[in-house]
A protein has these predicted regions:
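Left-handed beta-helix
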Residues: 152, 157-158, 163-164, 169-170, ...
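Short, high-confidence coil segments that cap the C-terminus of an alpha-helix
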Residues: 34, 61-62
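Conserved N-terminal catalytic core of the sugar/cofactor nucleotidyltransferase
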Residues: 1-52
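Catalytic-core segments of class I nucleotidyltransferases/pyrophosphorylases
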Residues: 36-38, 45-46, 50-58, 68-143
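Long, charged amphipathic helices and adjacent flexible linkers at domain junctions
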Residues: 137-159
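Conserved small/polar residues in nucleotide/adenosyl-binding loops
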Residues: 180-181
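Conserved beta-strand segments of alpha/beta enzyme cores
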Residues: 12-14, 63, 110-112
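Short, hydrophobic beta-strand segments that form beta-sheet elements in well-ordered domains
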Residues: 64-68, 155
Length: 181
């Protein structure tokens, strides 16, 4: 709702290839003509409601609002920044938002840190990806679990393998299938 109120439902999505760029250069590129931007790094999964970070950012007069999850209070790669945050920086110098810029903004009083809620996982390796998948499949506390109430009239596309411990409920139609016992 906050996004709609502030931007009248017109939100621009920029996907930036950061190959050879620092995160500061990528965020600058994504800003285009905007005065502030919500940046969400693509290598993380987070269930924290983004409207909360927007609300906190709008209620403070700072250059940056960042979501944190680590016990070290490091930014999680989800932040809102204003253009003014970059004015004193050398545009050619490789700099990292979460390692360099946001910590400096916190020290100077120009940033607000928000404690993240819910699930957060940074995915930087194949092992981290698999760990995240396992967590989402087997953690009973995941609020986004699919239940019979999520969808109605859904069709499952082929091919589908139904393995051990899967329940096929009455009313299900299985056609043109091989059954291995």
């Amino acid at each position: 709702r906050l996004l709609d109120e502030k931007y009248s439902g017109k939100i621009k999505l920029h996907m930036i290839n950061t190959a050879g760029k620092s995160t500061v250069q990528a965020v600058r590129t994504a800003m285009c003509d905007e005065t502030e931007i919500l940046a969400v790094e693509c290598n993380c999964i987070c269930t924290h409601p983004l409207d909360e970070i927007i609300k906190v950012h709008l209620s403070h007069d700072t250059f940056c609002t960042a979501l944190t999850y680590d016990t070290e209070n490091k930014p999680a790669g989800i932040y809102i920044v204003k253009r003014e945050l970059f004015e004193s920086l050398n545009p050619e110098k490789p700099t990292d938002m979460t390692e360099d810029i946001i910590p400096e903004a916190v020290k100077s009083g120009e940033a607000v840190l928000l404690d993240g809620k819910g699930y957060y996982k940074r995915i930087t390796t194949p092992e981290a990806f698999l760990d995240c998948q396992r967590h989402m499949l087997y953690n009973e506390n995941m609020s986004q679990r699919l239940t019979e109430n999520n969808f109605s009239g859904a069709a499952i596309g082929e091919p589908v393998y139904i393995g051990e411990n899967v329940s096929v409920m009455s009313g299900s139609v299985i056609e043109l299938s091989l059954i291995h016992i």
